[in-house]
């Protein structure tokens, strides 16, 4: 069996017992003798493990009762178009088969012992067991345990008490003569939110490895990086204020260099309001182009699932981080995100813009219960005026 590839197994089912006898069992004299007393029909009816209810039950029973703390994989060998007989069993045409002829339906019925009369078989009716049957009682019990007969989706989460815009007052006042990057502004906003008594436990900062690039390492000490096993080593920067601190109760998800894993965490938190009835506020910060290239399809998936949260595209801009190659040149990420119908894309320049946009997003998603998520680019380094400051902001000498 270990010498046989999947395509051959498919052919054995499609071409019947004689072919299987010659091509599979006939390879070796020992295996040929094993089926010498069996007819071709007997051989064609040899079942695969994935269709054997006893084997499937035994496999799941062993899987759920193992107490070793490890996941269990069940490899089930099955047959394409199982039960269709000559109409499609083991054949590639199964995928295009829209209906079965009456003779094929009768063969299917007889094979699986479905009690449908000959005069009704042409209509291919559904078979429903009696209400007091063991099968129906089992199905009703399972639906009751699952919470009802129809799948349903929560459209509203618990409404959160969002802080007033005045909570960001220092950022609304501008930076005076000091240059301030929008990356730093975002980090300060995140720090304000994680100190707010009403929503601090709902904030989920997510970073795929680039925390220091985005200036977010200052949050390591106060929030900690989540690790299910805690800190297992002494960080080389342990003597510094912003050292790499892991903790079982850490709040930051620093996933390592895996954008796919990080955005999966984002989607899980962003849909928690619907799936679990607990509203979370994820902030997923990544390289706006390098990171986007690895999660583009997930961004659409987030929209399809009505995710709510913030995605932050760091080191944005066409010439920001050229030293690491063309893969980082971002002059179009907003165009890509704008293609997702329920994603709102912004490119703020000044600190007050960043504060207003994020505050508006919090209100829109977590009070008004709108099914949108925000994409905001962060990078620009300017002197930031206040909204009422009519002075022209000075471009930095490095611009």
Predicted regions and their residues:
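Long, well-ordered, tryptophan-enriched scaffold segments
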Residues: 1-173
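Conserved small/polar residues in nucleotide/adenosyl-binding loops
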Residues: 382-389
């Amino acid at each position: 069996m270990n010498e046989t590839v999947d395509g051959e197994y498919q052919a054995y089912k499609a071409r019947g017992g004689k072919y299987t006898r010659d091509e599979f069992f006939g390879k070796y004299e020992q295996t040929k003798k094993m089926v010498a007393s069996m007819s071709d029909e007997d051989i064609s009816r040899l079942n695969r493990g994935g269709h054997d209810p006893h084997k499937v039950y035994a496999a799941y029973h062993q899987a759920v009762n193992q107490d070793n703390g490890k996941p269990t994989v069940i490899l089930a060998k099955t047959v394409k178009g199982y039960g269709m007989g000559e109409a499609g069993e083991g054949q590639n045409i199964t995928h295009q088969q829209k209906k079965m002829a009456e003779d094929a339906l009768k063969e299917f019925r007889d094979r699986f012992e479905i009690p449908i009369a000959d005069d009704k078989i042409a209509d291919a009716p559904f078979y429903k067991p009696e209400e007091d049957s063991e099968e129906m009682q089992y199905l009703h019990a399972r639906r009751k345990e699952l919470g009802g007969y129809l799948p349903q989706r929560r459209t509203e989460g618990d409404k959160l008490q969002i802080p007033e815009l005045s909570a960001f007052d220092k950022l609304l006042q501008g930076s005076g003569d000091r240059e301030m990057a929008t990356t730093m502004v975002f980090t300060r906003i995140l720090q304000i939110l994680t100190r707010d008594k009403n929503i601090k436990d709902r904030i989920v900062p997510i970073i795929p490895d680039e925390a220091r690039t985005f200036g977010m390492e200052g949050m390591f000490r106060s929030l900690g990086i989540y690790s299910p096993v805690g800190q297992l080593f002494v960080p080389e920067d342990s003597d510094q204020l912003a050292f790499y601190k892991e903790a079982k109760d850490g709040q930051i998800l620093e996933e390592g260099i895996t954008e796919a894993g990080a955005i999966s965490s984002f989607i899980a938190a962003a849909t928690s309001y619907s799936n679990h009835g607990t509203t979370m506020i994820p902030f997923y910060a990544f390289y706006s182009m390098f990171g986007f290239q690895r999660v583009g399809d997930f961004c659409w998936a987030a929209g399809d699932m009505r995710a709510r949260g913030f995605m932050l595209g760091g080191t944005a801009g066409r010439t920001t981080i050229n030293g690491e190659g063309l893969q980082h040149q971002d002059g179009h990420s907003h165009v890509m995100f704008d293609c997702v119908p329920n994603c709102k894309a912004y490119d703020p320049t000044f600190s007050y813009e960043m504060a207003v946009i994020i505050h508006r997003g919090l209100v829109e998603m977590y009070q008004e219960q709108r099914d949108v998520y925000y994409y905001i680019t962060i990078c620009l380094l300017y002197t930031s005026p206040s909204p009422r400051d009519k002075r022209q902001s000075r471009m930095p000498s490095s611009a």
